[in-house]
């Protein structure tokens, strides 16, 4: 029985993995609730997922290093994301007042394209921030690289896109699932989704960072 629960057993590792994602998820949700610290929450989520995949474990010291080196850049990106989403929402409200079906279709297509591009950039910039220091002078370069990586590895990118779209779509189609889905995301689902995104992107990001270092 002692071997069954030993630190090197599969059961212990699985329970440790679940507990880590649970704690990280709760910490991130608290950060998102404060709004201004949302960028740090994303760093915590992506940093923890990266450590789990590369090292098999997450220590507070390692996670703190990941957060400390990029917290300011992450905060700026987060606030820019919020402003961008507010702009898209405002444009969507105006779109409802447009009478011409052609203009409405064209405008709606541009809004959807803008949202998709922003989402693709975010899906790759946060893993980059979690893995290395990004100076202010290189931020725009990293954003362009994130966009290029998202297009270059489109099938992997759409894993994150699917996870992002699936949750609101599920709630829209099944109103009775709202509280269950909300509880899942608040307790575990957010960290689990980030883990899947980081896992899908690990190989191309490893190759990209190795090519930069050489």
Regions found by a protein language model. Give the residues of each.
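Helix-coil boundary and N-terminal low-complexity module in membrane systems
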Residues: 1-111, 118-214
